[in-house]
């Protein structure tokens, strides 16, 4: 299946929920929405798997790295400890702007 081949997630193609659980998000979105750093995505073991696609909006820009949202959310909980801690950190960042 697509998810097994690219993200090592045992889910058949007909069971895939591309709109929510198995949605793909960009690296930028993962960093902004879940307050993750490059090292959280790429260096922290196990490094998150991703696919590379051409940027559909700006063909001159670099390729996009797309991560599986399910795995990004799980990593964010590892980094921040809980959903509440993540929300608190977002609020602090918003106040500091």
Curated annotation (Swiss-Prot):
Protein name in UniProt: DNA repair protein complementing XP-A cells homolog
GO biological process: base-excision repair; nucleotide-excision repair involved in interstrand cross-link repair; nucleotide-excision repair, DNA damage recognition; UV-damage excision repair
InterPro entries: DNA-bd_dom_put_sf, XPA/RAD14, XPA_C, XPA_CS, XPA_sf, Znf_XPA_CS
Keyword Nucleus: yes
Stored CDD domains: DBD_XPA (cd21076)
Keyword entries, A-Z: DNA damage, DNA repair, DNA-binding, Isopeptide bond, Metal-binding, Nucleus, Phosphoprotein, Ubl conjugation, Zinc, Zinc-finger
GO terms, molecular function: damaged DNA binding; zinc ion binding
Family: Belongs to the XPA family.
Residues where Zn(2+) binds: 12, 15
Chief location: nucleus
Keyword Metal-binding part of the UniProt annotation: yes
Positions of modified residues (Phosphoserine): 82
Subunit structure of this chain's protein: Interacts with GPN1. Interacts with RPA1 and RPA2; the interaction is direct and associates XPA with the RPA complex. Interacts (via N-terminus) with CEP164 upon UV irradiation. Interacts with HERC2.
SUPFAM superfamilies in UniProt: Putative DNA-binding domain
Listed NCBIfam families: rad14 (TIGR00598)
Pfam families named among the record's database cross-references: XPA_C (PF05181), XPA_N (PF01286)
Annotated zinc fingers (unnamed), start-end: 1-15
Organism annotation: Cricetulus griseus (Chinese hamster)
GO cellular component, one term: nucleotide-excision repair factor 1 complex
Subcellular location: Nucleus
PTM description: Ubiquitinated by HERC2 leading to degradation by the proteasome.
Role summary: Involved in DNA excision repair. Initiates repair by binding to damaged sites with various affinities, depending on the photoproduct and the transcriptional state of the region. Required for UV-induced CHEK1 phosphorylation and the recruitment of CEP164 to cyclobutane pyrimidine dimmers (CPD), sites of DNA damage after UV irradiation.
Matches recorded under PANTHER family: DNA REPAIR PROTEIN COMPLEMENTING XP-A CELLS
Glycyl lysine isopeptide (Lys-Gly) (interchain with G-Cter in SUMO2), cross-linked positions: 31
């Amino acid at each position: 299946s697509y998810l097994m081949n690219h993200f090592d997630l045992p889910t058949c193609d007909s069971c895939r929920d591309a709109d929510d659980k198995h949605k793909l998000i960009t690296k930028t979105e993962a960093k902004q929405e879940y307050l993750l750093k490059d090292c959280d995505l790429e260096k922290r073991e196990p490094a998150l798997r991703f696919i590379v696609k051409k940027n559909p909006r700006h063909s001159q820009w670099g390729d996009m790295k797309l991560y599986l949202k399910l795995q990004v959310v799980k990593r964010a909980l590892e980094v921040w400890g809980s959903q509440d801690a993540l929300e608190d950190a977002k609020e602090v960042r918003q106040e500091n702007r």
